[in-house]
Amino acid sequence: MAFLKLTEQNVRGKTVLIRADMNVPFKGGKISDDTRIRASLASVKYCLDNGASVIVMTHLGRPTEGEFHPEDDVAPVAAHLGGLLGKDVKVLNDWRENKPALNAGDVVMLQNVRINKGEKKNDLELGKAYAALCDVFVNDAFGTAHRAQASTEAVAQAAPVACAGVLMAGELDALGKALKQPARPMVAIVAGSKVSTKLTILESLADKVDQLIVGGGIANTFLLAEGKAIGKSLAEHDLVEESKKIMAKMAAKGGSVPLPTDVVVAKAFAADAEAVVKDIADVAEDEMILDIGPKSAAALADLLKAAGTVVWNGPVGVFEFDQFAGGTKALAEAIAQSKAFSIAGGGDTLAAIAKFGVTEQIGYISTGGGAFLEFLEGKELPAVAALEKTRRVNGLI
């Protein structure tokens, strides 16, 4: 991937427009988790430290275009950002009619981009209006990189200079390191409730990895493909043949899809359900598999400890219930102990990492969500493609 980076730009005396992802959750009218705001600070501070004025734009929630309601207002986000920066951050509601006059060190925020007509349809005129505000456009919203919208793609086409922010560049560099030029052996963990939601990821990674670990309901479908009885466990019978193809593809290249030989089962899916460890051959018709067993966890942990690269998306058991958390904990700790470069993404994965206290030991934790998954699928991310295109158009590569 060839794109300009903010940290390569001379921004002194310039106005920088940063598309951030500050779509934070609220509880009781207050921001309940400011992780996304803090993740964007590096780019804002870089600009301020280097003599620029900054305009931040972000989406918040899912407002209807052309309508504005109190819950759509980014004012609380601007106030929180201002608190972190130690300066006032004003919200601009009429920025199209009144272009702001800014001095070096100023920070302002545009009102919620998703109330603007044409935002979701990637309207070029709206993109030009955004671009007219700045000398340099910075996309630092990796979480929206898989969407072609006016504040992520059209603006990049129209801006004098378009580059990746600190967070965006970090995400892309880490993903590139993990998937484009991985240290071997490369091991991926893909887990979740359904094969159907991760089928393209499984197929894409099967072309790249040396070992493909599956977990959760996905593993149950693969167990069915191996002819194993899984009781009343969640599985997709219509995707057994697809699972067989993926296993055959891995075997043909000398790899494998290592499936559990022992599992943790219960009669019901509940926080107080009794957990029983069983050999996979002994799962009864009225039981459901809710985690991998200790023998399987130990074997998979050995694979991870010996890996050169690990890509992790999804817990291998119902880790929210402690009695079914052993498998995910064992794998998380193995990744933490491994010398491999590791990258992890997805909401449940990040929650598991936090629960088991291995955040500092993971090589890179992606904030991307849907963008992370689409990158794993091998899809082009529109916002990233726009940055690459503008670099080529400007004759910079």
Curated annotation (Swiss-Prot):
Annotated binding of substrate, by residue: D21, M22, N23, R36, H59, L60, G61, R62, R114, R147
Molecular function via GO: ADP binding; ATP binding; phosphoglycerate kinase activity
Top-tier EC class: transferase
Keyword tags: ATP-binding, Cytoplasm, Glycolysis, Kinase, Nucleotide-binding, Transferase
Compartments where located: Cytoplasm
Residues given in the record as ATP binding sites: K198, E320, G346, G347, D348, T349
One Gene Ontology cellular component annotation held by this UniProt entry: cytosol
EC nos: 2.7.2.3
Top-level taxon of the source organism: Bacteria
Protein name: Phosphoglycerate kinase
Source lineage: Bacteria, Pseudomonadati, Pseudomonadota, Betaproteobacteria, Neisseriales
Encoding gene, per UniProt annotation: pgk
